[in-house]
Amino acid sequence: MNMLIKRVIAIKNPRGDDNNNNKLSDLETLTDKCTTCPLTLMRVMAFFVVSFMLFSVLFSLSVVLRDPPSDAAISSTTTLFQLNQGLGSDDFDSVELLNDKLLGGLLADGFDEKSCLSRYQSAIFGKGLSGKPSSYLISRLRKYEARHKQCGPYTESYNKTVKELGSGQFSESVDCKYVVWISFSGLGNRILTLVSAFLYALLTDRVLLVDPGVDMTDLFCEPFPDASWFVPPDFPLNSHLNNFNQESNQCHGKILKTKSITNSTVPSFVYLHLAHDYDDHDKLFFCDEEQLFLQNVPLLIMKTDNYFIPSLFLMPSFEQELNDLFPKKEKVFHFLGRYLLHPTNNVWGLVVRYYDAYLAKVDERIGIQIRVFDTDPGPFQHVLDQVLACTLKESILPDVNREQNINSSSGTPKSKAVLITSLSSGYFEKVRDMYWEFPTETGEVVGIYQPSHEGYQQTQKQFHNQKAWAEMYLLSLTDVLVTSSWSTFGYVAQGLGGLKPWILYKPENRTAPNPPCQRAMSMEPCFHAPPFYDCKAKRGTDTGALVPHVRHCEDMSWGLKLVDN
């Protein structure tokens, strides 16, 4: 430092006269005294750095204590879901915000993120997977994606299959085999059956093609990279898909009943009728002997409104593969649903706007899904009584104090947001008014919200189904869930969210049941119409008592569901 000062002075005084030399001498003396200056400056700088860091920590603590962050969402200032500015912000490249956007390897990388924002943004809500998928499942999904790319619409293999389908002549060896899923029934049923059909395709090395129906492309993103899963508009059988039934000559059940095809004959395609009204011959689909016949058929057309996966777990030919794919049996729909089902940007906008406005900044989110199977839309007092009896008895919601106007508890109250979904607004209004008119006994602040109330189910209306899909997804983002018996709407929400819900028993004679609800054994949906047949013994049997991981459902005594051993 001394040499630097001397050089500066030398430049300023090139003549070097005596007067200036005296000044230089004085300055040299001064600089000699400042040899310890760097140490002093360093100490001062260190003091300011430490002070700044301490201030930052104290400021952060004050923010956290004043407004505790939610476990399941980031604050509205960082959700980045400003739809009017475009959902596809580059800020989503941040590793911290994405929070393992690939869900532990379940999802494939390489998609155009802006085309389907929900695929990678769902992790922002803190709703990662409930558990870790097996490495075998992940590897099989990657292999399936490669097969789908090789065999998908308009590939060489697909074009060959379509050509042979038109001629009725199939070569003995085909590179690709297909299962075509027919869009059928309500949205909840369609979601459950879509996952069922995909698992069947995975088990049988087939490629899944999805009938777009009237609205599937408006609801769901493409799940597989580089190839569509939707049946092309020029598929030869498109005009017949909605007409197939049990009387069709290509129906598997009718083929067995009439013995119209021998084992040596391979039809160009077979129609599988697996809907709730299927008969005993149709149900033989779940026997290994019939799978041996079907494995040679190049194209299977499937119509179902049932989540039939539990019965696949009872088939010896699939047993080992399923055990390897899903060591935890209750997470089949959870893993496959999170892999396959990504809301389109329109639906995702509904989800994030509502979540950010009403659910993001609370301590706990509670979902209550009310479905009444009655010709009268309601609301019904006995249903309201049952909902309140369940939620208060199980301490899901706090009771109210009808004797006081103001709660006198001190401290920062805990906040709860209650999301109610129902075709009627009556239940929402009653619960909302209760928490408006009276304080809670616990001092908690309870907000009641309902996104829509359509009055009745409108299966074929596009925006109705978009809102229904958004509400299922919102329910899946809650911390505690209450669902209605028999409802596929609730099954989808619990499965996607990895939640074991409290299930409201189905009322009889318009009377609230006692007890009002029961905790689910697992997060898996219920198969409402399973077969009760022992394929090996060729006689009827209780299929809910054959293996430890397939049991009868809580809400439907004859149904089947997967549970952990």
From Swiss-Prot:
The keyword Metal-binding does not apply. It holds the Pfam family XG_FTase. Residues 1-43 are cytoplasmic. GO terms for biological process: cell wall biogenesis; cell wall organization; protein glycosylation; xyloglucan biosynthetic process. Keywords: Cell wall biogenesis/degradation, Glycoprotein, Glycosyltransferase, Golgi apparatus, Membrane, Signal-anchor, Transferase, Transmembrane, Transmembrane helix. Its EC number is 2.4.1.-. GO terms for cellular component: Golgi cisterna membrane. Disulfide bonds: none annotated. One of its GO terms (molecular function) is galactoside 2-alpha-L-fucosyltransferase activity. It comes from the Eukaryota. Glycans are attached at N159, N263, N407, N509. InterPro entries: XG_FTase. The chain crosses the membrane at residues 44-64. Pathway: Protein modification; protein glycosylation. Residues 65-565 are lumenal. It is a single-pass type II membrane protein. Involved in cell wall biosynthesis. Adds the terminal fucosyl residue on xyloglucan side chains. Belongs to the glycosyltransferase 37 family. This is Galactoside 2-alpha-L-fucosyltransferase. It comes from Pisum sativum. The gene is FT1.
